[in-house]
Amino acid sequence: MKKTLAALIVGAFAASAANAAVVYNNEGSKVELGGRLSVIAEQSNNTVDDQKQQHGALRNQGSRFHIKATHNFGDGFYAQGYLETRFISHYQDNADHFDDITTKYAYVTLGNKAFGEVKLGRAKTIADDITSAEDKEYGVLNNSKYIRTNGNTVGYTFKGIDGLVLGANYLLAQARDTANPGKKGEVAAQSISNGVQVGAKYDANNIVAGIAYGRTNYRKNIIAPKQNLGRKDQVEGVLSTLGYHFSDLGLLVSLDSGYAKTKYYEQQQQQRSSPTKPRYDEKRYFVSPGFQYELMEDTNVYGNFKYERTSSDEGKKTREQAVLFGVDHKLHKQVLTYIEGAYARTKTNGKGKAETTGKEKSVGVGLRVYF
């Protein structure tokens, strides 16, 4: 019988965690090192009303390094520290995206196997893993538009029931103002002020089901309102997924969806002759059917389609259709190669403006080596 798709995902896509090197293990304390080097060769083409831009690249694709320390107290209690780094690039100087090293995640955890765990620091939230669509690089879903994903958070996760994950997160301010005298240390304009989210996901007995709700508040731009930093006030959103594993076939079919409402605040212009910009709301939703299929041992095929629509009280409407398809193959338990392509078409209608159409095509061949 073929492996279940859940087992494939654990084995193929989380290899870095499963095969991390244990450098210390004594008296209930364990330290692990792991990560991956990942490179992609790609060709992409962007077209907006016949204005074409095309380029090819050989670049970093999410290479990372992590260290994890776990200390068991007994009776199921434990503490854990986790640090993960990534590369960032100044695109004008380093087109290969291998440049400065930055911290992606850094958090501490206190937990109990029966009662759940509390996580504090820069970490993923329940919204990160709600949707089921698979991708390596050109994912057409953007969960952060609906519910803010990873960030500075205090989170609780419960995994005491087989296949069920319950989570809740409180988001803290993400950025501080350092440029304005007298305002240093305050939350930066148009950055996250605070937020809250709750969610649940079930993946057992061939059923996948998940839902998450989040509300994120943003700092108003009250220091220099004539600067065009945006007027975002609050984003309230829902993400959900529903899927089924056909275990004998090695096939998962799923449907991801989301809805969000963004509130923009009224803003008085600095010049008295300029009219006040009124408040308005923007609504968006998407639906995305997808699949993941074990073509043969160590080879998987995956894909999904997305339809997304956005409309605002100001009269602007956007419709996007996107499709992604990919194939991956494990050359070794710690070596993964893949080819992936995506195509997206976006139509935008503004009040009193002509419709514009944008297209984006991308295809890439990648190699990941885990350690």
From Swiss-Prot:
Its main location: membrane. The keyword Transmembrane helix does not apply. GO terms for biological process: monoatomic ion transport. GO terms for cellular component: cell outer membrane; pore complex. It holds the Pfam family Porin_4. Keywords: Cell outer membrane, Ion transport, Membrane, Porin, Signal, Transmembrane, Transmembrane beta strand, Transport. Residues 1-20 form the signal peptide. It is found in: Cell outer membrane. The keyword Membrane applies. GO terms for molecular function: porin activity. Changing residue 184 to Q: In strain: T2. It is a multi-pass membrane protein. Belongs to the Gram-negative porin family. Homotrimer. Forms pores that allow passive diffusion of small molecules across the outer membrane. The sequence of strain T1 is shown here. This is Outer membrane protein P2. It comes from Haemophilus influenzae. The gene is ompP2.
